[in-house]
């Protein structure tokens, strides 16, 4: 095959995928390429290759894909059959296209074609097997579809519209909603840059969305875009962030407000959200600091925009300004090259990457009841990958 180098934009990154795609016990290769002599607007080509006895590869089948690049490739192995899901994209279109192929008798045949904004395979009904889940935005309307099969023979397809009106889908997160029940959390952003989260799961043959099915529940998830739904602490439960001004900031203008992040979980009996945790969420700095319980209603913050440093303060309603309040703890995000300089100034390393590190400095007196131990600081700070 003569072609130009390609990159697949998801789990499978190579332009070649070697695996058993027809359940015959032998590996085949899927090759994705474009012809060097053609324009950049041509559709990507997909080729199936079989291994020869001498270790080489022979092209067995070829077709044109439904886009100029491959967005994602997923395989669904049902034992006797394998579904090949290929998502295609094109710079000229907001929509992406998915084709589900089956390779049998030397032919790569399409058994499903559709459009998507986000696609994935997740177990939404707790059956132990993943369903294909398609989230699609058309205009400002958002819908979700599921394609379910346990054997690759009988397929059930379901679709429903969601309540949210969106300019774009900013992300999807899969995880536990409550008591072993998993769901898909869809973050959608409106034209005024407000983010909402829709929750979707399967109950039997029905797509259920607590946020769309209960009046006022979707509105409870409103916050500025950039605050992502996530399992921030790695416990398997997904929480939704909403914000409220820290103590002492309610009378200030919006641009000057420092917000506390309240993490919401869902209670199926109440059919409502409850507050699971409070934190300071530094979106630009890439970290979350969970507030210990004894800090609730007693602490506020002050941010140094020049140094990207946050100082937690003991709230004093009699103080004339935030800056007059007693400091408890400072957290700084800095380039790794500056670590030694901060260490010389009394800061202690908490966490970091190859490029940035997180350090803290305790500035409260030893007798202060709100003073945190080193272990408390470390266990409550979470680095958030972008």
Where does each model-flagged region fall?
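Beta-propeller blade termini
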Residues: 13-21, 68-78, 82-83, 116-124, ...
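Solenoidal tandem-repeat scaffolds enriched in leucines and small polar residues
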Residues: 102-194, 200
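Beta-propeller fold detector
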Residues: 58-64, 109-115, 156-163, 209-215, ...
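Structural motif
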Residues: 38-47, 92-100, 140-149, 192-203, ...
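Beta-strand-rich domains and repeat architectures in extracellular enzymes and scaffolds
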Residues: 9-36
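Acidic/hydrophobic-patterned starts of short beta strands in beta-sheet-rich repeat architectures
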Residues: 23-33, 77-88, 126-135, 178-188, ...
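N-terminal targeting sequences that direct proteins away from the cytosol to non-cytosolic compartments
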Residues: 175-178, 192-196, 206-317, 336-386
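Short, small-residue-biased leader/transition segments that mark boundaries at the very start
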Residues: 1-8
């Amino acid at each position: 095959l003569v072609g130009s180098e390609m990159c697949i934009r998801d789990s499978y990154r190579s332009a070649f995928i070697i695996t058993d795609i027809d359940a015959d016990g032998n590996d085949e290769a899927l090759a994705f390429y474009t012809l060097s002599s053609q324009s950049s607007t041509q559709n990507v080509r997909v080729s199936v290759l079989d291994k020869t006895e001498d270790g080489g590869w022979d092209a067995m089948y070829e077709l044109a894909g439904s886009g100029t690049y491959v967005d994602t490739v997923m395989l669904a192995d049902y034992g006797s059959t394998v579904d090949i899901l290929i998502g295609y994209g094109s710079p000229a279109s907001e929509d992406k296209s998915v084709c589900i192929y089956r390779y049998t008798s030397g032919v790569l045949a399409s058994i499903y074609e559709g459009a998507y904004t986000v696609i994935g395979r997740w177990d939404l009904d707790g059956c132990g097997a993943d369903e294909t889940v398609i989230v699609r935005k058309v205009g400002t309307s958002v819908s979700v579809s599921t394609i379910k099969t346990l054997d690759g023979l009988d397929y059930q397809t379901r679709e429903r519209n969601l309540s949210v009106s969106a300019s774009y889908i900013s992300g999807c997160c899969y995880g536990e909603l409550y008591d072993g029940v998993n769901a898909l959390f869809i973050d959608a952003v409106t034209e005024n840059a407000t983010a909402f989260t829709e929750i979707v799961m399967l109950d039997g043959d029905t797509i259920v969305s607590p946020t769309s099915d209960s009046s006022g529940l979707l509105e409870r998830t409103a916050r500025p875009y950039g605050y992502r739904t996530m399992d921030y602490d790695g416990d398997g439960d997904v929480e939704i962030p909403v914000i409220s001004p820290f103590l002492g900031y309610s009378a200030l203008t919006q641009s000057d407000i420092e917000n506390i992040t309240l993490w919401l979980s869902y209670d199926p009996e109440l059919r409502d959200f409850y507050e699971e945790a409070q934190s300071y969420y530094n979106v630009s700095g890439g970290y979350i600091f969970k507030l210990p319980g004894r800090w609730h209603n007693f602490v506020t913050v002050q941010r140094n925009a020049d140094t990207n440093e946050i100082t937690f303060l003991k709230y004093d309603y009699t103080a004339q300004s935030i800056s007059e309040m007693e400091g408890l703890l400072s957290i700084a995000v800095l380039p790794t090259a500056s670590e030694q300089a901060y260490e010389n100034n009394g800061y202690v390393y908490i966490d970091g990457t190859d490029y940035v590190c997180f350090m803290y400095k305790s500035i409260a007196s030893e007798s202060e009841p709100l003073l945190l131990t080193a272990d408390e600081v470390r266990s409550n700070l979470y680095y958030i990958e972008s």
